C-alpha cells in the first residue's frame, strides 16, 4: 500500500505553482526593480505569496551556481570526477575557469532574493491585516514573524554570495541605486550581521516541538542564532587568516558582535530550542529508508529481503526530513535549516524546473550504472582515497558517509570500473541516487514515496533535502568558541568514539568527519587559513582511473584566489567598470 501521496514543503511548496510564480511581476521580468509596490502585498495573502518569492531564490538554475556543489569541488576531500565532457566542474576542481559566467545564476538569484525580501520588509508596516486576524496581538505576532523571516533570508542570500564572491554590492531597499560598487568584505558582513540581529529581534522564541509541519522549513529564531555563529566564525577567521587583519569581532550597524555574544546565542539554541542529535548519525540520510521503502512499494518484495544489507544489519531507520513531525520516519530534531527540495518538472519556471529537485544526488551518483539500491548519476565528486584510508573504521560515520563501489554488502557488487574520470572506487553516500523496484519498474525511491508523475524521472526524482545547518554544528561551534570539549564529545560519542580533550586540531578533525560532503569543509579550510598550509589533502598525489586508464592526480588550490571564486564577467561588463574581477581570476 502506498503510504505517502505527496510531499509537504511548507507554504513555499514546490509541487504546485505558488513558489514558481511567487514574485509575479517581480522575478525574472524586465520590470524587476520598477514594480509599483503600492499595489502589492497589502494583506496576509499577498505577504505570504511574497514570502514564497523570498524563499524561491534559494533555488538556482545553473548547477555550478549551487553553493554546496561549488564548495564540494573546491574542497580537498573530493575530486571532480564525471566524464570527459564535464570540463567546467573539472576546471573548478583545479581552481580554473574557462566559462566567464559559471556562477551567474548564483549572482542573479542573490539579488532576486534580496529584492523580494526588501519588498516584504517595506510592505509589512503598511499592510492591512484586520481581516486576517481577530486581535492586535495576533497581527503583531504575524508582522514580527514575517519581518524576521525576511531579514534572515536577506542575510542568508548575502552570506551565501559573499562566501563565494567576497564583497558584494549592497541593495538595502527596493528603490536603492543598483549601480553601486562592490562593498568591502567588512561592509558586506556588517550588512549581513545587522540583518541577522534584526531577525533574532523579531522572530519568536518557539520550541521546535510546537512548530507545525506546514511551517517546517521556514526560518526561525534558532536558525538565525545558529547562522549568526557561522557568520561570526567565518568572517573573523577569513579576516584574520586570509586577509591577515586580525579580529575577533563581527561589525553591525550599531556596534560589534563579540565572541561572548555568539556563545550566548548558541547556548540559547542548546538549552531552549528543542533541537538535539539524532541517536544514529546514519539515520539522517535517506539510504537508511531504502529497505523499508522497497518493502512497501515493491510488489515482488519477499519478507526479510534487504536490498541494502549493511543498513539492515545495522538496524537503520530514517528519521525523515520534515522536522520533528516528519511525514516519514521517527522525526528529525537535528536539522535546523534545510533547502527543501521537491520533485522537479521541466515545465516549471520557464523550463528551469530541474532546480526544484536536489541535483547533488544526480550529479554525485555512480556514473553509467543503474544498480539497486544505488542508481545512476553523473559520477562527480569521487572521494579522496587518502582521506578515506585515514578515517578509522570504528567511526560509524565512515561507512555512513562514503559509498564503496564493488561491495555486495553496500549494494554495489555489480559495479564495473572504467566508466568515469578520477575514479577512486569511493563516492558520496549522503547525497546519491536511490532506487528500487515498484509497480512502475526500477525507479527512484522518492519517485515512489512521493507518487511522482513525470516523463523524465531520472533527472528529477531526487526530492532529498539539503541540510544547511545541523545541531551537531551548533555543538561543535560552541566547543570551538569556548575551547571546551563538551559539545565535541557529544558528537564523538554518537559516532562510537571515546571522549577526547579539547584542542583546535581535535575540532578540525571532528568537523572534517562529521560534515564530510555537506558543503562545510571548504569554508572551514578557508576560515582557519588551512587552504594555505599543509593541513589539508591538496597537492597529495593519488592514483585514479580515467575511463579505465590509470593516472596520477592531486587536488589543487591556488592561494592567489584568496578563497574566492570568479564573479560573473557579464556582471563586470554590465557595471560599466564599477566592478573588478577577484584576484587570481
Regions of interest found by a model, annotated:
Residues 24-87, 218, 222-225, 230-422:
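An aromatic- and glycine-enriched ligand-binding surface/loop that stacks and positions planar moieties
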Residues 22-26, 110-113, 185, 193, ...:
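Long, intrinsically disordered, low-complexity segments
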Residues 145, 152, 167, 219-226, ...:
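Extracellular structured ligand-interaction cores
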Amino acid at each position: 500500500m502506498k503510504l505517502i501521496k505527496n510531499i509537504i514543503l511548507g507554504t513555499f511548496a514546490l509541487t504546485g505553482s505558488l513558489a514558481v510564480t511567487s514574485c509575479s511581476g517581480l522575478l525574472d521580468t524586465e520590470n524587476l526593480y520598477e514594480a509599483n509596490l503600492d499595489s502589492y502585498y497589502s494583506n496576509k495573502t499577498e505577504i505570504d505569496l511574497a514570502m514564497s518569492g523570498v524563499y524561491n531564490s534559494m533555488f538556482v538554475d545553473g548547477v555550478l551556481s549551487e553553493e554546496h556543489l561549488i564548495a564540494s569541488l573546491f574542497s580537498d576531500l573530493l575530486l571532480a570526477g564525471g566524464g570527459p565532457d564535464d570540463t567546467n566542474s573539472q576546471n573548478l576542481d583545479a581552481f580554473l575557469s574557462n566559462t566567464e559566467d559559471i556562477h551567474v545564476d548564483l549572482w542573479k538569484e542573490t539579488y532576486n532574493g534580496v529584492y523580494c525580501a526588501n519588498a516584504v520588509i517595506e510592505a509589512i508596516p503598511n499592510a492591512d491585516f484586520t481581516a486576517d486576524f481577530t486581535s492586535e496581538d495576533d497581527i503583531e505576532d504575524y508582522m514580527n514573524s514575517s519581518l524576521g523571516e525576511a531579514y534572515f533570508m536577506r542575510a542568508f542570500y548575502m552570506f551565501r554570495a559573499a562566501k563565494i564572491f567576497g564583497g558584494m554590492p549592497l541593495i538595502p531597499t527596493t528603490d536603492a541605486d543598483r549601480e553601486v560598487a562592490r562593498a568591502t568584505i567588512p561592509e558586506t558582513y556588517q550588512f549581513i550581521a545587522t540583518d541577522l540581529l534584526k531577525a533574532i529581534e523579531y522572530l519568536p522564541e518557539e520550541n521546535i516541538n510546537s512548530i507545525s509541519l506546514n511551517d517546517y522549513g521556514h526560518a526561525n529564531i534558532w536558525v538565525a542564532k545558529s547562522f549568526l555563529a557561522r557568520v561570526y566564525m567565518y568572517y573573523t577567521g577569513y579576516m584574520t587568516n586570509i586577509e591577515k587583519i586580525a579580529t575577533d569581532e563581527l561589525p553591525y550597524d550599531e556596534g560589534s558582535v563579540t565572541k561572548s555574544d555568539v556563545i550566548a546565542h548558541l547556548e540559547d539554541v542548546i538549552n531552549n530550542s528543542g533541537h538535539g542529535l539524532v541517536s544514529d548519525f546514519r539515520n539522517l540520510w535517506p539510504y537508511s529508508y531504502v529497505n523499508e521503502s522497497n518493502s512497501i512499494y515493491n510488489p515482488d518484495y519477499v519478507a526479510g529481503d534487504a536490498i541494502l544489507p549493511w543498513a539492515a544489519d545495522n538496524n537503520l531507520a530514517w528519521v525523515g526530513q520534515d522536522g520533528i513531525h516528519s511525514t516519514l520516519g521517527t522525526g528529525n530534531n537535528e536539522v535546523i535549516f534545510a533547502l527543501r527540495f521537491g520533485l522537479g518538472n521541466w515545465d516549471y519556471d520557464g523550463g528551469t524546473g530541474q532546480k526544484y529537485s536536489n541535483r547533488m544526488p544526480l550529479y554525485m551518483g555512480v556514473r553509467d550504472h543503474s544498480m539497486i539500491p544505488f542508481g545512476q548519476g553523473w559520477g562527480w565528486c569521487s572521494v579522496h582515497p587518502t582521506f578515506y584510508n585515514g578515517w578509522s573504521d570504528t567511526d560509524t560515520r565512515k561507512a555512513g558517509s562514503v559509498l564503496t563501489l564493488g561491495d555486495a554488502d553496500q549494494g554495489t557488487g555489480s559495479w564495473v570500473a572504467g566508466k568515469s574520470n578520477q575514479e577512486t572506487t569511493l563516492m558520496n553516500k549522503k547525497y546519491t541516487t536511490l532506487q528500487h523496484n515498484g509497480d512502475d519498474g526500477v525507479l527512484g525511491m522518492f519517485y515512489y514515496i512521493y507518487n511522482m508523475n513525470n516523463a523524465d524521472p531520472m533527472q528529477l526524482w531526487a526530492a532529498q533535502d539539503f541540510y544547511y545547518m545541523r545541531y551537531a554544528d551548533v555543538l561543535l561551534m560552541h566547543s570551538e568558541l569556548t575551547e571546551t570539549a563538551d559539545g565535541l564529545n557529544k558528537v564523538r560519542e554518537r559516532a562510537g568514539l571515546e571522549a577526547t580533550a579539547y584542542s583546535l586540531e581535535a575540532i578540525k578533525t571532528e568537523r572534517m568527519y562529521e560534515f564530510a560532503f555537506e558543503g562545510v569543509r571548504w569554508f572551514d579550510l578557508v576560515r582557519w587559513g588551512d587552504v594555505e598550509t599543509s593541513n589539508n589533502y591538496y597537492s597529495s598525489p593519488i592514483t585514479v582511473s580515467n575511463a579505465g586508464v590509470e593516472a596520477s592526480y592531486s587536488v589543487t588550490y591556488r592561494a592567489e584566489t584568496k578563497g574566492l571564486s570568479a564573479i560573473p564577467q557579464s556582471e563586470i561588463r554590465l557595471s560599466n567598470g564599477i566592478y573588478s574581477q577577484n584576484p587570481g581570476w
